[in-house]
Curated annotation (Swiss-Prot):
It comes from Mannheimia succiniciproducens (strain KCTC 0769BP / MBEL55E). Residues 228-334 form the HD domain. Comprises two domains: an N-terminal domain containing the nucleotidyltransferase activity and a C-terminal HD domain associated with both phosphodiesterase and phosphatase activities. This is Multifunctional CCA protein. Monomer. Can also form homodimers and oligomers. A single active site specifically recognizes both ATP and CTP and is responsible for their addition. The gene is cca. Magnesium is required for nucleotidyltransferase activity. Nickel for phosphatase activity.
Amino acid sequence: MQTYLVGGAVRDQLLNLPVKDRDWVVVGATPEQLLSLGYQQVGRDFPVFLHPKTKEEYALARTERKSGAGYTGFICDFSPHISLEQDLIRRDLTINAIAQDNQGKFIDPYEGISDLKNRTLRHISPAFAEDPLRVLRVARFAARYHQLDFSIAPETIALMAEITEKGELQQLTIERVWQETEKALKEKNPEIYFQVLLQVGALKILFPELYALYGVPNPAQYHPEIDSFLHTMLVLQQAVRLTENTEFNKSAVRFAAICHDLGKALTPKDILPHHYGHEKAGIQPIRTLSNRLKVPTYYKELAEFTCEYHSYIHKAFELKPETVIKLFNKLDVWRKPQRFEELMLVCVADTRGRTGFEQTAYPQKDYLRQLYQTALQVNVQQVIEDGFEKQGIRDELTRRRTIAVKTKKAEILPRFVGQ
């Protein structure tokens, strides 16, 4: 019985990146042997065990043979005679098929180390096509390692496109699609994930609402990048920069960024490149996308609010105090202050997600935050003590908050408009 460190731990070690989880493969053993050594079996479809002390995962070396559609139709053989090389070849990419023995020696039968040096994501064998989820996984790896100048091998791109064309992606469960997408949103370059999916034809199938933005023009005066899909990817880039090293819900903000302009795909062709009313028009595509992929409610709500109100927020200096309070009420910022801050981040990203506007200031954020903080100072308890009841409490709160915002606006607006 021999154990080898495999997968991401070896790959990231060779890239001088922090190693998060360590996975092991066991060659020449049976489930009974591992159980007798105190390992705990957790794998349902094939034997995976937890080490009695470290709780790290140890899997018996196995081969997989395609037996049906999708990514679950496999027959596994995990008998003791399966070699390390046989186990490694079933993996997706060469860079994920490097093993390390107990002496620190690397076993690299499929030239993964060479591909790491050349910054190439390359599939190991034609068996890659047997698991359509790998199309999304490779797109996600491209997003993760883009900062290290990795690119996908042309033959792997071609195979991903072939898998897509054959309709294999339709076999994926929505849970797995969202799981891969949410992971991609947490990477440093999530826009690469969507661009790769576009390149191989998968975006149209999995994210038709986002794909519909491709080729839809914007006025060049405000959007030198012109294309609505490209603008959305630039906004996503900016959202990443704005949410790094913050306590905000990064994935929710980034999801809102990719959804904020979905309504532009529905703009009547005769009024292009203008997009009057795209804010309201975008609500339904967001709901359709979110419901189909079972996106978390918090993400969906933030995306909808961003879509509907981002243009209002861009014009914050023109809003009447009554409109500002109405906006705050709709966002329920009194109970959800984080939502206010996250919405502001997407609006900043929207402004900067345009070619040549990457460093643009966004004073609307500080202006609205000051109005918000002023409105927060209106004391609910005082309203109740003044004798108001039920609906009267809410009406009086709105009245007092509006007065407070009106006073604050008169005080600070000249300073902001003069910037």
